[in-house]
């Protein structure tokens, strides 16, 4: 499920480290978290939608890799981000 343009822009503006930032790990992880939340809500209602479940697992894996990268590069940015997003990890 793709994010609407205005929602995506709001997330990018909130988590950007500098103006025009769309590729930093913080922004990517925040966007993935929003998509994961949406797919999780979808799967609560449509339990047998296995194609969506696979897509969700791929997104979770991608977010996990980005979180691992961020924790290796800058642990303080990592801790601040998971606190802001409310990701228990």
UniProtKB/Swiss-Prot annotation:
Answer whether the UniProt record assigns the keyword Ribonucleoprotein to this protein.
yes
What gene does the UniProt entry assign to this protein? rpsO
Keywords linked to the UniProt accession = Ribonucleoprotein, Ribosomal protein, RNA-binding, rRNA-binding
Under the heading InterPro entries, the entry gives:
Ribosomal_uS15, Ribosomal_uS15_bac-type, uS15_NS1_RNA-bd_sf
MF terms from GO for this chain are: rRNA binding; structural constituent of ribosome
CDD domains associated with the record = Ribosomal_S15p_S13e (cd00353)
Q: Its biological function?
A: One of the primary rRNA binding proteins, it binds directly to 16S rRNA where it helps nucleate assembly of the platform of the 30S subunit by binding and bridging several RNA helices of the 16S rRNA. Forms an intersubunit bridge (bridge B4) with the 23S rRNA of the 50S subunit in the ribosome.
One Pfam family from the record? Ribosomal_S15
On subunit structure and binding partners, the annotation says: Part of the 30S ribosomal subunit. Forms a bridge to the 50S subunit in the 70S ribosome, contacting the 23S rRNA.
Q: What family does the Swiss-Prot or TrEMBL record give for this protein?
A: Belongs to the universal ribosomal protein uS15 family.
Q: Name one GO biological process term.
A: translation
Q: What is this protein called?
A: Small ribosomal subunit protein uS15
What's a single GO CC term here?
cytosolic small ribosomal subunit
């Amino acid at each position: 499920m793709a994010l609407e343009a205005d929602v995506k822009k709001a997330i990018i503006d909130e988590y950007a480290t500098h103006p025009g930032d769309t590729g930093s790990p913080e922004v990517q992880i925040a966007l993935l978290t929003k998509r994961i939340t949406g797919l999780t809500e979808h799967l609560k209602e449509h339990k047998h939608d296995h194609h969506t479940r696979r897509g969700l697992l791929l997104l979770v894996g991608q977010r996990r890799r980005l979180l691992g990268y961020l924790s290796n590069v800058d642990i303080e940015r990592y801790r601040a981000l998971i606190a802001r997003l409310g990701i228990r990890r």
